[in-house]
Design a protein with these regions (language model features):
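Short, low-complexity disordered segments enriched in Ser/Pro/Gly and basic
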Residues: 452-458
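Short, compositionally biased
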Residues: 521-532
């Protein structure tokens, strides 16, 4: 009888535990709903900041190209040249004051999400990134809008997380949502915006992060579509070539080999020149003078190659040249110009210059195919789109983002299948060539820079998700990596002593670790708390 009473009491406790846990999980679902709503607000704010950024870049490019197209008298070039030089010197001064606004912004965003970097003054830095990116672009440099848009979005996510008092473990979701919304605002591609967060920034798939990023991306993409109702990439006419299966595979294999080798050269040159540029002891104003001189000479020859070269790419895709040598010369010129521009460290991304180089490389391969009768002239734009996706895979090493982005922004689903085939081959070839993703190289250069302020220990905040590995575990029973420890558990507005605490869904857990381990441990620790 006594045994029966004990069993009954135990069963009652189990039922009560399940009931309490059920109510707790139900309450967490309401908290998640709040987070999803806030992420949509982040997407809206990011769109309201990043879309005007895109519009101003578009406006200033056409203002600049109109000036050069009018062939003004020689003396009008002097004030524009000096003004452009002064602009870049000012932007370089801004970067010196706030190093995080330099470059594209994707490596910085990754650093903030994994806890290595902190946005101490997000609003001031966001405004500086906005202004610095516009001024650098207006000077004619070969820089893209996507990196700054991503970082602007992460700044918005940081600000909103402060305003709404979001829990520590959820802040990274808003940062990721803002980053994805930034890319969606730059290209009106919400699906690709979620994928770039998964592949290049977070580097793994946490369900809540994916949902918040997609929601924010859809809202930001809607804002972009209102301001830019006509996507210029939709104007590209594509005709799919008709050839036998084995001929098609052979052609795609050749394209994959060419793009892989060129991608290796592109990445290696970018990395090498960035290190050489950093070691040059000339004053910043002298470096900016050389940069403006190169940009101005190219503007006089082919103004559409400035500003990343996107307008030149669109023109070639719609009604391009048939001269192989001329296109090759222009591609090499654009490549050298992009290397100079990106290596300067000025605010601006390398995504669009990479996209343009890939498109022009595809045009060359397509024209060679026309010359040998493999495809027709009307099929060249088709090869260009496939090559754009392929070159992004080779350089950035984000195959899903590259394939979906090109399909999404062009609306041509007929390039999806060849992009998957060529992209898969290239991903394998780049593994053989031991190519490191460009954003990873930029991130490593950033955290190993002499002026980078590094702490000895970092704290990672994670949220325990329902049915994750850490759900229900006693802190004392966990075998964490060496010199890695849980220092606090935040639950229902209270801080609990970790020892003896059983983790439950919704707990905000702070894990302290050495600085050299944060990149290695971020993914496994967050996965243990988030993935189910």
């Amino acid at each position: 009888m006594e045994l029966w009473d004990k069993a009954e009491r135990l069963w009652t406790r189990v039922k009560n535990w399940k009931t309490v846990r059920g109510w707790h999980i139900w309450k967490l679902k309401l908290v998640d709903a709040r987070l999803y709503f806030v992420s949509m607000f982040v997407g809206l704010l990011t769109g309201l900041v990043a879309v005007p950024y895109h519009y101003l870049l578009y406006y200033l490019f056409h203002l600049r190209s109109g000036f050069f197209a009018s062939h003004p008298a020689w003396y009008w070039h002097i004030p524009l040249f000096l003004f452009s030089w002064g602009i870049l010197v000012f932007v370089m001064w801004l970067v010196g004051k706030m190093p995080l606004i330099g470059g594209g912004g994707i490596p910085q965003t990754r650093g903030v999400i994994n806890g290595r970097i902190t946005y101490r003054h997000p609003f001031i830095e966001m405004v500086s990134k906005f202004v610095g990116g516009i001024l650098s672009f207006s000077a004619g440099l070969s820089l893209g809008r996507e990196g700054p848009s991503v970082q602007i979005g992460s700044y918005v996510g940081s600000l909103v997380s402060r305003w709404t008092h979001i829990l520590k473990g959820e802040q990274k979701q808003l940062l990721a949502a803002g980053a994805g919304a930034g890319l969606a605002a730059a290209f009106a591609a919400p699906l690709a915006s979620s994928l770039i967060v998964i592949e290049s920034i977070e580097r793994f798939d946490a369900p809540k992060t994916a949902i918040t990023t997609l929601l924010a991306g859809v809202v930001a993409g809607a804002v972009a579509s209102m301001v830019f109702p006509v996507n210029p990439y939709h104007l590209i006419e594509v005709t799919e070539p008709v050839f036998a299966f084995f001929v098609q595979m052979k052609y795609f294999l050749i394209l994959a080999v060419i793009v892989s080798v060129c991608g290796k050269f592109y990445s290696s040159t970018m990395n090498a020149f960035r290190h050489v540029y950093a070691k040059v002891n000339s004053p910043a104003y002298v470096k900016m003078l050389y940069l403006v001189l190169v940009a101005y000479i190219i503007s006089l020859m082919q103004v559409n190659l400035t500003g990343g070269g996107e307008q030149f790419l669109l023109a070639q895709a719609q009604n391009g040249s048939t001269q192989i040598m001329w296109v090759t010369a222009v591609m090499l010129l654009h490549f050298v110009f992009s290397v100079f521009s990106v290596s300067s460290g000025l605010p601006g991304g390398s995504f669009i210059p990479t996209l343009v180089t890939g498109g022009l490389l595809g045009q060359i391969v397509g024209l060679v195919g026309v010359r040998y009768g493999v495809i027709g002239q009307e099929n060249v734009s088709y090869i260009m789109l496939v090559s754009m996706s392929a070159f992004l895979v080779a350089v950035v090493r984000t195959p899903l983002t590259a394939i979906v982005l090109i399909t999404e922004i062009t609306g041509h689903f007929e390039v999806f299948y060849p992009s998957v085939v060529v992209g898969g081959l290239i991903y394998y070839f780049t593994e053989l060539l031991q190519m490191k993703p460009s954003n990873v190289s930029l991130y490593e250069d950033m955290i190993h820079a002499p002026d980078f302020k590094e702490e000895k220990r970092y704290t990672l905040s994670v949220e325990i998700m329902t049915d994750s590995y850490l759900d229900g575990k006693l802190v004392d029973e966990l075998s964490l990596p060496e010199r890695c420890a849980i220092i606090n558990v935040h639950r229902d507005g209270k801080n609990l002593v970790p020892a003896g605490t059983r983790l439950i869904p919704g707990d905000q857990v702070q894990i302290e670790m050495d600085s050299q381990d944060i990149e290695k441990l971020y993914e496994p620790l967050v996965s243990m708390a988030n993935i189910y």
